[in-house]
Structure formats: structure tokens, C-alpha cells
């Protein structure tokens, strides 16, 4: 491994106010590193410090700079003196955009903006958060996926899925053609679950909240792998320091497909009465197809019927020495954090 001791320069984390970003900050601070993170506006800085302190990390080793992925200002200051950059920030649409480029262009250009700044200021390695969305959305029927698989953004896919594939491809192309000595490693998790550190919920954690509150009495038969947010954070740290990680992408997940109904059963069996409102039934494929005529959410689910993706995580285990938590632990810890922070409406 690199000689990266806590006394060396700061590690830059983009998007430290986000769900994954806050866990990456926490993991770095707990490991004794000095950390610099970016926020889009100054009013987010205090919340980032408060979250770090609440998680038990030392916010005194945390520096915050303002830099927006949509503008050049601030990035030279952000990367100055850093050997490593963990590029975690990426746009996630709160609603369906009017045009797919509203999501695709900011994701691609933001990644390139970070990479250019890193190259120009002598950063050794960038670890970029991509997604399984960039890996496994162009095959029907599921099956086993590894790092050689790629999603084709020319397919009929959601803007978010396309954005992950386009941004990651652009990052690899830039590094090969213009990166100079800059190294790139990429982390590709599926849906990220696990405990929240503050009251701002990701879409995936919001799904668990909805299950606990009874907002989803039934769920479609959708299958997917799960990554624990703490495991994804650790994968970033290991990819940052492991020499063999340079030039590689890593699938991060349990390696076993679960389903929405399977998650509901984990909640019911693990929490008893506290999960009394969890989904009690899984829709049949026929019900999904019928509902897809009028329900946009079911329309997307209908396109996934019969798809059971399995992620091969052998490379992450072998190269990074990484091991995932179980789905049960991840789901129950997600719920536990929601109850602890008072985020579940009775």
C-alpha cells in the first residue's frame, strides 16, 4: 500500500454533505486522516461539521471549501495539496427531468471538472463513485455481472442510469487520453442502504422509511443487490491506497440478489411490531403489467420483470481485501437509524 499516514496531506472528498459522502468523511476521520470536503454553498458547511461530530469523528481535522460541480470556481483551492481525491458527488434527480441532458451533462462535466483539477494540481489518484447502473442495465434477464460489463447509454434507459454510464466512460477516456500520470479507480455499487448519519434521506433509505410507515402495502417483484453504505465507504478508502486498484473498477455488493418483498420480510422478522406496516404482499407480474398502463413507477418495474442480477464481487475481495455485510444487517441497521433519529412517522 501507499505510505499514506494521517500526517500527510488532506484527502479531498467531493459531496461530503450527501449520504455516502458523510460516511466516507466519517471513515477517513476515524482513520486519522485530515480531510477536505466540498459543499455547493456555504450554508451547508455547518451541517457537515455537525454530522461528523454526531457520528463521533473529530471535526477539527475537517476543512470545508465551496465548489460546485457545475462551475470551475473553487476546484483549484479544493485539490491544492491533496494526493488523493474521492469523487463521491453526483447529481440525483428528485423528479423526472424534462430532458435527459439535465442529468447526463452535469454528471459527465462535473466528473471531468474534478479530474482536470486533480491532474493540473499533482493529485496522484482519484477514486470515483460510479454505480451498477453503469454496468448492468443493457442485458435482459439478469445473470451474473462483472467489471467487464457496461451499460449502453444508447439503450432506452432512465436519465439517471444513462448519466452514470456516460460519466464513468468519460472519466476513463479522459484519464487515458489527457490524464498524464493521474490514476483512476472506480467503485460501482448497486442500491446503497445502511444507517443514516443525519436527517437527509437518500432515495434508497426513503424506500425503507416508506415500508415502515405503511406507504407501500404491496411491492412489485423487483430484484437487486444491496451495498451497505459503510462497506462502500471502506471500499473507497481501500481503493485510494492499494496500488493494484489503479486503472480498475470494482463492483461492491453482497453478491446475492434480494427483492423489495425480501427486504420487507427482513424488517418484519427483525423488528416485529415496529415493522407491522411493512409490505404484506408482492404483486404478481400480471398485476404489474396491468398497473403499468397508468402508474409510471410500475411502468419502470414492468421493464425489470424477470431480471435477477447477481454481482460478482471477487475482484473487490481479492484486490481490496474487502468483505460485505449481510443484507439482513444492512436493512435492519437502516431501520434502526431511522427510528433512532425519529424519522419514522408512527
Regions found by a protein language model. Give the residues of each.
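N-terminal Rossmann NAD(P)H-binding glycine-rich loop of SDR-like oxidoreductase domains
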Residues: 3, 9-33, 38
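Mid/C-terminal beta-alpha module of Rossmann-like enzyme folds, strongest
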Residues: 5, 235-300, 318, 332-346
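NAD(P)H-binding glycine-rich loop region in Rossmannoid oxidoreductase-like domains
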Residues: 42-43, 47, 53-109
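Conserved Rossmann-fold NAD(P)-dependent oxidoreductase catalytic core, especially the SDR/UDP-sugar
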Residues: 87, 91, 96-160
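A conserved pocket-lining segment of Rossmann-fold NAD(P)-dependent short-chain dehydrogenase/reductase
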Residues: 96-97, 152-156, 198-199, 206-231
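Active-site Tyr-X1-5-Lys
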Residues: 155-184
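Glycine/proline-rich active-site loop of Rossmann-fold NAD(P)-dependent oxidoreductases
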Residues: 180-182, 194-207, 239-250
